[in-house]
Design a protein with these regions (language model features):
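Periplasmic-binding protein-like
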Residues: 149-156, 224-265, 284-303
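N-terminal secretory signal peptides
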Residues: 1-6, 10-26
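A ligand-binding cleft/hinge motif common to bilobed small-molecule-binding domains
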Residues: 117, 131-139, 209-243
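Bacterial lipoprotein signal-peptidase II cleavage site
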Residues: 27-38
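Extracytoplasmic small-molecule ligand-binding "clamshell" domains
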Residues: 49-130
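Ligand-binding clefts/hinges and TM-proximal coupling segments of bilobed small-molecule sensing domains
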Residues: 29, 181-198, 235-237, 265-303
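Extended ligand-binding regions for polar small-molecule ligands
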Residues: 28, 41, 51, 91-100, ...
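Flexible hinge/capping segments at coil-to-helix
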Residues: 156-173
Length: 303
């Protein structure tokens, strides 16, 4: 497995250290709908007009269903398993949110490029789709407290391992996913690198496998997982740019829901919920060595 070519120190530099807390039990499924089919329709009057585009906390509780945007093709964070059920790190968290809200979770499949749109149009109440916090995004949506650390990384075939973005060959294409921090970062910091853009994680992975680009830039957690799960690939750049955090997002101005999520994240930190989430959904991919570097408990990143 080519993941072994990445030093632990290099990986940690891209992810940083986070504070840890205490313990937790797994979330129950009785208060959430895990079927992929359940995400095909949006529950409640989410898409209202004007400033009422979002549903408040009380409106969500009254409806009995919370619409949560998650990935359906990004294993191990959000994906649909062989039984048609949503699984992954973000989904595990989403089910707990729904349970503690006392409502059912209606999962709505999202792509990276439409996460903001789905909030702005009221298609979802919450985005839990590996959403990296950036100043630009914070102008359009409201982010809750973080629950994970992340940086960017670059994966490429063993036959031509990319270890630097300097002196780039103008004929070589870099694969990115539209709407991701990788696209934004490369466009700004490396404008001379041609970008081959795709709408989903599945199509980006297929593009790399088919040789449509020399490398794929994305969250380092994602490219490391890809290299571990697919022989013949190496993460030659495990840390690119600065360390960032991943957090839930709600529609701009939805303070009642935002405040509730922040309080929930703090409360879950007292139970070490996200360590439990990691051990249930991510440990097979990243192992136990990186748990404390990836997990953010109680919203206290870099504490």
């Amino acid at each position: 497995m080519k993941i072994n070519k990445i030093s632990r120190r290099a990986f940690l530099l891209g992810l940083g250290a986070v504070s840890t807390a205490a313990l937790l039990s797994a979330c129950g499924g009785s208060a959430s709908s895990s079927s992929a089919a359940s995400g095909s329709a949006v529950s409640g009057s989410a898409a209202a007009a004007g400033s009422d585009v979002f549903r408040t906390l009380d409106e969500i509780k009254a409806d009995g269903t919370v619409n949560i945007g998650v990935f359906s093709d990004k294993n191990p964070f959000g994906y649909v398993d062989e039984n048609g059920e949503y699984q992954g790190y973000d989904v595990y968290f989403a089910r707990r949110l729904a349970e503690d809200l006392g409502v059912e979770a209606n999962f709505v499949s999202t792509e990276a490029a439409n996460r903001i749109e789905y909030l702005q149009t009221g298609k979802v109440d919450i985005i839990l789709a590996n959403f990296t916090v950036t100043p630009e995004r914070a102008e359009e949506v409201d982010f809750a407290l973080p629950y994970m650390n992340v940086a960017l990384g670059v994966v490429s075939p063993d036959s031509n391992v990319i270890t630097s973005l300097d002196n780039w060959n103008a004929d070589d294409q870099m694969i990115v996913i539209s709407g991701t921090t990788a696209e934004t970062y490369l466009t700004k910091e490396y404008p001379d690198i041609p970008l081959q853009k795709y709408d989903s994680y599945a199509t980006a992975k297929n593009a790399l496998e088919n040789g449509n680009g020399v490398a794929w830039a994305n969250d380092n957690t994602e490219v490391i997982a890809f290299a571990k799960q697919n022989s013949g690939y190496t993460v030659g750049i495990p840390s690119l740019g600065s360390q960032d955090t991943i957090a839930p997002a709600v529609s701009k101005g939805n303070t009642t829901l935002l405040d509730w999520i922040n309080d929930e994240i703090k409360s879950l930190g007292e139970e070490s919920f996200f360590h439990k989430d990691y051990e249930e959904t991510l440990v097979d991919t990243y192992g136990l060595d990186y748990e404390d570097e990836l997990v953010v408990e109680g919203g206290e990143a870099n504490a």
